[in-house]
A protein has these predicted regions:
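Mixed-charge (Asp/Glu-Lys/Arg
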Residues: 1-82, 87-215
Length: 215
């Protein structure tokens, strides 16, 4: 009986020790991301993938833009950002709003990111909007961004920015960030036509409304 109690005691001690060690490692990792003196050039895409949430990614981008020499760089308050995580002024003197999405590669960014960052432009008096992600974008997200001239920076672009910064090539990093967005433009005939785009109707809703009205 005493032997069994001793074994149980040892198991409990080992379990608690492992839990405390795991917690300490997590706390250390979080502190690393928010300490003002951590080496920004040491951060790689792998470090971004290990971040526990989006706030670490936002802080990284905030510091990166400052290091790249941009002016008017601000990190917004998380709870009331109206769709923008970081704001900065580019080399042309144009204010940009950024929405940062730290997603794992198996989860692409959807259209809500474009909707949110585009809708907050007027609030921040910005002329350009950017969505930056550690993942990729859905096809519908790319389409909506192209129509509204929202710049999309995906994982591949982000890696190029990080590598350029780590190599000390600030101009290349800024050129990637400030490159014109992929635009989806209408032809001249479409732009001057009175024909509206086809709307995908909800026929169930239409049928229901007709039924209600007919009563």
């Amino acid at each position: 009986m005493i032997y069994i109690l001793f074994v149980l005691f040892v198991v409990v001690i080992i379990t608690l020790s492992l839990w405390v060690l795991s917690l300490a490692r997590k706390q250390k990792k979080s502190v690393l991301l928010f300490e003002e003196n951590y080496d920004l050039k040491a951060i790689t895409i792998a470090d971004i993938d290990r971040m526990e949430d989006g706030s670490g990614f936002e802080m990284y981008l905030y510091r990166l833009l400052i290091e790249l020499g941009y002016s008017g760089v601000y990190k917004t308050l998380g709870s009331r950002d109206f769709g923008a995580d970081v704001v900065f002024t580019d080399r042309e003197g144009v204010r940009n709003v950024i929405q940062a999405k730290r997603y794992s590669t198996e989860y692409p960014v959807g259209i809500s990111a474009v909707q949110e960052v585009f809708s907050c432009m007027r609030y921040y008096k910005a002329k350009k909007a950017i969505v930056i992600t550690s993942s990729h974008f859905t096809e519908s997200c790319e389409t909506l961004a192209g129509i509204n001239f929202v710049k999309l920076i995906d994982r591949t672009d982000l890696i190029h920015v990080i590598e350029a910064f780590r190599d000390g090539d600030m101009i290349e990093a800024r050129d990637i960030i400030e490159a014109e967005p992929r635009m989806i433009l209408e032809s001249w005939s479409e732009a001057n036509s009175n024909t509206l785009h086809e709307v995908r109707k909800d026929y169930k809703a239409e049928k229901y409304v007709k039924k209600v009205i007919s009563k």
